[in-house]
Amino acid sequence: MLSWRLQTGSEKAELQELNARLYDYVCRVRELERENLLLEEELRSRLSREDRWAEDQALYAEEARSLRQQLDELNWSTALAEGERDALRRELLELQREGVEAGTARSRLDAELGAQRRELEEALGARAALEALLGRLETERRDLDAAHERQVRDLRARAASLTMHFRARATSPAAPPPRLRDVHDSYALLVAESWRESVQLYEDEVRELEQALRRGQESRLQAEDEARLCAQEADALRNQALELEQLRARLEDELLRMREEYGMQAEERQRVIDSLEDEKEALTLAMADRLRDYQELLQVKTGLSLEVATYRALLEGESNPEILIWTENIENVPQEPRNTSYRYTNSVLQRKNEKNLFPRRKTPWAAVNHSSASYSNWPGHLDSQTTTAVGSAARRGLLTSRHSSSATTSGQQKPLEKTISSRANLRPVTPTHGFLRNTDAQMKTLPHRSKVEGTGDTHARRATESVITRESYRGHQGHVAAGAVSSTPSNERTVILGKKLEAQATKEQERDRSGVIRIKPEEKMFDSKEKASEERNLRWEELTKLDRDARKRESRHLRDEAREKEALKERSVKEREVPISLEVSRGSRAEVSTIHLQSPGRKDVSHSGGREAETKETRFRLDTQDTASSLQSDSTTETIAESIVTTILKQFTQSPGAEEEATSFPDTKVTYVDRKEFPGDGKTKTEIVVESKLTDVVDVSDEAGLDYLLSKDVKEVGLKGKSTETMIGEMINLGLKGREGRAKVVNVEIVEEPMSYIGGGKIDFSTPFQVEEVDDVSPSPKGFVEEEDGEGETHMAFSMRPHQTKQPQGTIPHVEEVTEAGDSEGEQSYFVSTPDEYPGGHDREDDGSVYGQIHIEEESTIRYSWQDEIAQGTWRRKMRGDVGGEKPVKVLEVPALSLGGAIGSAHLKEEASGELRAEPTVIEKEIKIPHEFHTSIKGVFSSEPRHQLVEVIGQLEETLPERMKEELSALTRQSQGESGSVSVDVKKVQSAAGGSVTLMAEVNLSQTVDADQLDLEQLSRDEAGEIERAVESVVRESLAKRSSPVPRSPDREDGEEVPAGGILFKRWATRELYSPSGERDDAGQVSPSSDQRVTQGPVSATVEVTSPTGFVQSHVLEDVSQSVRHVKLGPTEMWRTEQVTFGGPTAQVVEVSGDFSEAVSSEGASRSVRHITLGPHQSQVSTEVIFRGSVPTWQETGDTEKPGPVVLSVGADISGSGRMPGSERSHTEKEIRFQGPVSGTAQVGGNFATEESVGSQTFVRSLQLGPKEGFREEIQFIAPIPDKVGWGEEDSEHTKVSLERATSIQRIDIVPQRYLASKQMAPQTLEFRDSEDMVMVEGSAGTIQATHNFTSDREILQNKENTFQRVISGSPPDSVGDTGAEVTANVSRSFRHIQIGPTEEEPSEYFVTGRPVSKTFVLDGSVASPGLVGGADGGSTPCRIALGPKETSFTFQMDLSDTRAIRSWTRDTGSEVEAHGVSHRGGWRIAHSRDERVASTGSGASPGDAHQAPGEKGTEQAGFDKTVQLQRMVDQRSVASDEKKVALLYLDNEEEEEEEGEGWF
């Protein structure tokens, strides 16, 4: 029993043990089953993932096939483009060859033309020789006829006087005488035979002469025919040469045009090829990335296979002792570490899925095809274009998501613009339409893993080749706006001079690379060594893969930068931009902008809690809209611009130490580059300080960081006074460099954009100045431009963009069009905008910028106006509407806060409807120089009239020339210690309806001038110096004879005498009040300035010589006179009237003005009337100054229209003065008269004033210039010559008679179809002239008549007849005819007939003179008065003068002992005319000479400065040469005495200026 119990007890214990083991086994089996279920579920999920991966691989393969197909298409299009390029090159070579052939043909034709011209010259020479031979033959024929007549008369006389004498001697018985009839018959037979023989002889001679004459006529006709044929051939050859020249010009223009066209097409195709190559390279890189990712996926799959094998081994190794230990670890370790490996692989798969988003983008290829197809379809593709084609910006890119269709890609934007969309908010990115002259900055954003999967991997390649093309078409422009949306910054790189500094911590990099991975030290450690080693291998592979990716990207960057450097070396470097990378905190948004010039002192401020960037920016760009809306910064942007940084920083050679200039005004020159490194927490920050070349763009979208950013200490740049001027000047100078060939129009706009924010701390503002330089064409389709070709000036319009679209409190800067169309190429406009200084004091919505305008023009006029909007009536607004995508701007009449009333502000509001509204406040301030009184004219007119003129003069004084200052100083001096005093009395002020203001003032000026201050030798500098010296000598002589008291100054209180010179000859300096020219403001009004003055001064005799270069005035202090001047300025012309009256001891002065509307008579005074009219279409200056000595009776009669009746008065001087105003005519008349005691004078003048008297000298010069008439001039110089009669006529319309006086008158009148009229002298002549050219002569003993007849019409026919008669007692006067003359004994007659027709240029002249005399007179030529010159004393010399190409031949005799010169001025034609007149007190003595015709050519000179004005139609001027080449030859055919010689003088066509101060007196 006991054994059984023991046995059963042991069994029971065993059963209990077995039950416990069974329970444990069942629990273990259940647990393993649960684990198996989990493993099966995991395997099923892995299999489903592999299935999805296989599907993705199929999609990848499909898209790769499509990409290959597109690549093939691109290769085919590239081959086609190359074929077209080769065809164009061949065509260009063909055109060049044709151009060479055309040049060869032209040279051959030029040679032929030269040969024909030489033949023509030879034919002309032969014709001249034949004509000379003909003349000689005719002369010989006349001589033979005369000899024949003499012989006939001799024979007749001999026959008549024939007598016979007979003598007979009767030595023998006388023979029977012959019969008388036989003797008579024999003699008759003898005489008849001799008569027949002589008649036969003479008939033979006459027949021979007739035959010779016939042959001469035939030869002459033949020569004329040959000359005519040669002329026709020459004309045909000339026309042919002209046609060939035109053809050559057309061919050259066509060649240039086709060359430009083909060059543009080649550039466009090369651009397309470059873009396609860039896309190909981008595809290659993308495919390499895909392969690399595929390799990584294979590695991950291998790792998963190893894990599956590990689990399988765990299942099979249940009996292994390590199971217990592994189980305990499983039970103790929490669930979270086990999911770490799952999350790791999940993140890896997520990264792969994100990269799988790439093949979904196919729109860039359509855009590329569109761009390549639209290159030839753009309407302005041959014009000046501006397109920025981004080259390699798509190498890494073509960046978009599956929602890239939401990014607008229109035909007016750049076809290859990169738009980045975020899958988190699906907001498209607006492209940047800025004019980026350099390449876009490369931006890389390392991917992240956030809760929202599928964020695009945005790798934007740097655009290395920035192809800039000129485009007038406003579309097809856009730029790469590469932004990235990311939540955490990854690693950061700062690039300096091609080096990359990469500071990062491993754990930080891991954390940045995947935002969800957390690798903790308590990671799951596998029990098995295999599992642990596998896990470590996976981690190492991941880490090494990250480093390998970074190294690959870095190597790609280096390759790209090397390629960019090569591209920069190949083309001219126009990039002045330095893109600088930004460091922005995690919650902020990064904006990358490319600028041209920056202001100094930009620094990145680093903080441990975050990174912010502050900027002081100066942008030099065109129409750059802010890209703030396109860059939503949830990531860190990495900007790399090594090549441009290297290119610009190579120029920096100065020393460090320029950081302290941060508070100075922005400089436009790069001075120094500094580099600093700041160690941070887990990273190293490198700072580059490039003064004036760096720009940091501040992101203000993050409101949380903006408060801190604006409240911390920011240095504020202040611009005031000279610093602003210096900065603007440097900007303008820098902008104008390299643009000498263009219109230099520079618009500089300075916009201060306040980053105002109501924060808790101190608020400072960074002030970026935006200066925009106007280029020739617009760079963007939305910043629109109008270019007007008519004036050569580019008018720029600046569009505007809201700075932020999502932040209602952000600063909204805008640029309005404030450019006004100017009228000069050299205009420079400055646009200055300054904001409110304290914008934090009012609402944020009312913040904005104020736009000022500074116009600096060539006339030193500054218009300075503050504007925030465009006034409707002043500025033009150019808006494209919805086509350019610009929002309409509406003007809201809402007043805004302005500082001091001088600054307005413009405000833009973003309303709910999306419309951009503007709140304008316009305050203008204009400062005009040199008319500053325009700004305060109200204050001037509000004062008393007595002080108005002085205030106006004070305002004008700084900008006037020195000479005007000196003259105006006499009106403004009021001190008593000076030698003169002035009193200004403004009588009345009148305002006319046309906007002109007449200010009538009386200025009483008395001043004593020392003789040492104004020396008489100053007049020698004038062009009429010799005349003035002669005039002054006469004045000195006349003053020396007069016992006048020492002049006194009437206003001197003490009455002391004025210091006198030797002969009391004093100069009184006249003060002329210069009125400013008519000034036009914007409304077109003319600034009024008008004055009258009456001057009292010790003046009685005044010498005023007006020359083309200036005024020289000298006054003789003798008496008190009065000067009245009236100056009135109207809107369209300036009229200046001067009435200067100088009184002297004269008996009576009577003056009648030209229009007979005014007659003034006074005792002891003479008048001087000056009319000066200055207008846009006419400039008339009429000056007449008359000075008198002791004149008993004086009378003036003027006539401007038609001559009045003849006035004959003994003891009276009659002269006329008048003006001839025209529509466009310049009239200058000057008369200077010096007279001593005058007994009596008489003269009648025409349109110009003349005067003569005994014992006085008068010089009168009248100049008249018209637009088509050239110069018209009249010069009279009268010397004291008794017993002479001077007469002259003008236009053959009036009669001039004067007795007992002598006058030498030279008048030069140049009109389009009327040559010069000359006047001569004849004593004791009574002449009546009418328009019919009828001449009546009443002669008595000793009468000489000279007649000049000029007829002018279209054919320019001139007839001139000179008739000189010397009637002796007992001889009746002969009637004068045109064809024949009957000359009685002791009567000499000279006829000159000059006729110039359309085909005959050389007139024929005949002189027949009666008896030899020793003194001669001058016969004026038909074109100009000849210069008479010679060297023999007492001998009469016939002078032969040839007048250039169109010769006027005449022969005259003159006595070289009595020669006077009269100077005349033809300033506009560039030469001077001098005429010589010969006069003698006794009378005229005409030399006897034969008719002489010498055809002379060549170049010669006359001794002296005699100039001739022969030309045709009053334009051609021929001058004498300065050197003397006088050839004397004895005329063999002269009948005169041996003293008679022939002087040949040649006139060439040189127009030379006569040396100043050399007169023939």
From Swiss-Prot:
Annotated positions of the Omega-N-methylarginine modification: R1481
Region (Linker 12): 164-186
Modified residues (Phosphoserine): S655, S778, S780, S1044, S1049, S1077, S1087, S1179, S1182, S1425
Conditions for induction: Up-regulated in reactive astrocytes following neurotrauma (at protein level).
One GO MF term: intermediate filament binding
Record localization: Cytoplasm, Cytoskeleton; Cell junction, Adherens junction
Region Interaction with TLN1 and VCL: start-end pairs: 1152-1453
Tissue distribution: Isoform 2 and isoform 3 are detected in adult skeletal muscle, heart and bladder, whereas isoform 1 is only detected in adult bladder (at protein level).
Region named Coil 1B: 59-163
Single GO BP term: intermediate filament cytoskeleton organization
Residues where Phosphothreonine is found: T653
Stretches for region Tail: 301-1561
GO cellular component terms, A-Z: adherens junction; costamere; intermediate filament; membrane; neurofilament cytoskeleton; sarcolemma; Z disc
Keyword annotations from UniProtKB, A to Z: Cell junction, Coiled coil, Cytoplasm, Cytoskeleton, Intermediate filament, Methylation, Phosphoprotein
Segments forming domain IF rod: 11-322
Annotated region described as Head, given as residue ranges: 1-10
Chain positions covered by the region annotation Interaction with DMD and UTRN: 11-320, 1242-1557
Top-rank lineage group of the source organism: Eukaryota
Region described as Coil 1A: 11-49
Biased amino acid composition, Polar residues: 371-390, 401-421, 625-637, 1086-1099
UniProt feature, compositional bias: Basic and acidic residues: 601-624, 1222-1231
Family as reported in the entry's similarity comment: Belongs to the intermediate filament family.
Function: Type-VI intermediate filament (IF) which plays an important cytoskeletal role within the muscle cell cytoskeleton. It forms heteromeric IFs with desmin and/or vimentin, and via its interaction with cytoskeletal proteins alpha-dystrobrevin, dystrophin, talin-1, utrophin and vinculin, is able to link these heteromeric IFs to adherens-type junctions, such as to the costameres, neuromuscular junctions, and myotendinous junctions within striated muscle cells.
Protein name: Synemin
Lineage: Eukaryota, Metazoa, Chordata, Craniata, Vertebrata
